[in-house]
Every structure is written in C-alpha cells, then in structure tokens.
C-alpha cells in the first residue's frame, strides 16, 4: 500500500470506493489476487475475507487461499435472512463451499442486521457442515 495525500492506494487503485474489491474484481481480477497473495506472503496464519458482497468475489478469494494452501474464512454481508448483498441466496453460497475447499475453516455472516442472523445461520447449516461464525452489526444503517 502507498499512502497518498488524502487516501490509500493498492496497486495504483484508489481505495476511496466503498466496494473497491468488487469494482477491481470486475476490472482487474489479477490485482485482487496479488493483494491477497501479499497478505499470505507477509506471514498471516489465517486470512479473514470479511464483508464479502458477492459469490464471485468469494470464489476468487477462496481460489487464492486454496492455491497456496492457506487457511481462511469467508464472511458474507447480507441484505436479508435469505440473500447476500449481490442478491444471491446464502444457501447457494453455502452449497458452493460445502465441498472441495479443504482450507476453508469457517463460513459466516457479518455487517448484517441482527434480526437476519438466525435465519442466515439456519440456511447455512442446511447446506454445509463447515463451522459458522457471525458478528452482526449493531443495527445502524450505512450507505
């Protein structure tokens, strides 16, 4: 990362965008891979992919971790007790990661309204047996 006068940049890309990873994932997926590889190379024992808004992003992150044999967890942000921010059902996300991801140590939900958590946990449990983690927000509304 390079410190710029009023914002951070990674690989020359401004982090001022609220969803910089999603934007860069679509435009420059190799940059996302390199950023996460650097975290592993720095010596992290486990990487926490948090507030993941899309299944596509989660798959890229999982691919990186699995390629290098690093343990990780993926935590989705959700719009309701059924869907992640992208509009895909959490059940589909859980099914996607149910098998074939040996280094995935937890699938979860964060930055999500507390009233949605119980339903999300049930849907994840119905579709995979990976340990579940949650840490809801305090209920505030964000842009």
Listing of model-derived features with the role each one plays in the protein:
Residues 1-143:
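Domain-level signal for soluble alpha/beta catalytic cores
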């Amino acid at each position: 990362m390079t410190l710029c006068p009023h914002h951070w940049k990674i690989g020359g890309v401004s982090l001022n965008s609220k969803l910089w990873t999603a934007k860069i994932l679509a435009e420059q997926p190799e940059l996302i891979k390199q950023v996460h590889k650097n975290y592993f190379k720095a010596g992290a024992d486990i990487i926490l992919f948090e507030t993941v808004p899309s299944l596509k992003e989660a798959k890229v992150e999982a691919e990186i971790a699995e390629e290098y044999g690093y343990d990780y967890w993926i935590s989705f942000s959700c719009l309701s007790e059924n869907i992640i921010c992208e509009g895909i059902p959490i059940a589909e996300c859980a099914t996607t990661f149910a098998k074939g991801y040996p280094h995935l140590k937890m699938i979860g939900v964060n930055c999500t309204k507390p009233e949605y958590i119980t339903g999300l946990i049930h849907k994840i449990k119905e579709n995979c047996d990976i340990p579940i983690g949650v840490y809801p927000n305090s209920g505030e509304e964000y842009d």
